Amino acid sequence: MAQNDTVKLIGSWSSPYSLRARVALHLKSVKYEYLDEPDVLKEKSELLLKSNPIHKKVPVLLHGDLSISESLNVVQYVDEAWPSVPSILPSDAYDRASARFWAQYIDDKCFAAVDAVVGAKDDEGKMAAVGKLMECLAILEETFQKSSKGLGFFGGETIGYLDIACSALLGPISVIEAFSGVKFLRQETTPGLIKWAERFRAHEAVKPYMPTVEEVVAFAKQKFNVQ
């Protein structure tokens, strides 16, 4: 597959998973056409259904005649298909395996905890779900402190694979903080993640694509019919 083949990205402005793909493409300076699915939960384009017939979700990267789906898979593909500097995944084999492990932890455990908070039916269920999400974030705080080695990002001095993976949590956490009144990123428990989130949001590869907290909360209120 030639690097200069046509590149398109099917995404949705509100999707934290689409953000992962857009940040990766920006870091690699890949020129692409962005095809937005404004409300992908209600209506999906024929191109999306054709390009990702199994999961029918964004993002989907179209590279020439190829389609690549699932956000972490897209990020890895972008890193390998455009091997120019900067590298998104670590060069060291152990560091690379570790980054993939924690990225999967985020998608499997942390998002499950987010969903549990949102779907809690009573106060007891909500308290249990909140505790689980707090636990996940405490583990990510510890991971950040070890991975960053005192620098600004999980990847060190620059945004890397685990930064991109973790970024998908920021929007959903902002929404459930607004809805539940519970603060999940706290100075006393996650000081590193708080500073990291500020740096990540302000980065030139992120800022053009990441919705503000206000935009995400407003979208969620409209979606769930919450005043």
Swiss-Prot record:
Locations listed in the record: Cytoplasm, Cytosol
Record carries keyword Phosphoprotein: yes
Ranges where the GST N-terminal domain occurs: 5-86
Catalysed conversion reaction: RX + glutathione = an S-substituted glutathione + a halide anion + H(+)
GO cellular component, one term: cytoplasm
GO BP field: defense response by callose deposition; defense response to fungus; glutathione metabolic process; indole glucosinolate catabolic process; innate immune response; toxin catabolic process
Top enzyme class: transferase
Keywords: Cytoplasm, Detoxification, Phosphoprotein, Stress response, Transferase
GO molecular function: glutathione transferase activity
Modified residues (Phosphothreonine): 158
Keyword match Phosphoprotein: yes
Domain GST C-terminal stretches: 92-224
Induction field: By Hyaloperonospora parasitica. Down-regulated by salicylic acid, ethylene and methyl jasmonate.
CDD domains: GST_C_Tau (cd03185), GST_N_Tau (cd03058)
InterPro entries linked: Glutathione-S-Trfase_C-like (IPR010987), Glutathione-S-Trfase_C_sf (IPR036282), Glutathione_S-Trfase_N (IPR004045), GST_C_Tau (IPR045074), Omega/Tau-like (IPR045073), Thioredoxin-like_sf (IPR036249)
Pfam families per the UniProt record, alphabetical: GST_N (PF02798)
EC number: 2.5.1.18
Residues holding glutathione: 15-16, 43-44, 57-58, 70-71
PANTHER family in the cross-refs: GLUTATHIONE S-TRANSFERASE U13-RELATED (PTHR11260:SF632), GLUTATHIONE S-TRANSFERASE, GST, SUPERFAMILY, GST DOMAIN CONTAINING (PTHR11260)
Function according to Swiss-Prot or TrEMBL: In vitro, possesses glutathione S-transferase activity toward 1-chloro-2,4-dinitrobenzene (CDNB) and benzyl isothiocyanate (BITC). May be involved in the conjugation of reduced glutathione to a wide number of exogenous and endogenous hydrophobic electrophiles and have a detoxification role against certain herbicides.
Homology family: Belongs to the GST superfamily. Tau family.
Protein name according to UniProt: Glutathione S-transferase U13
Gene symbol of the encoding locus: GSTU13
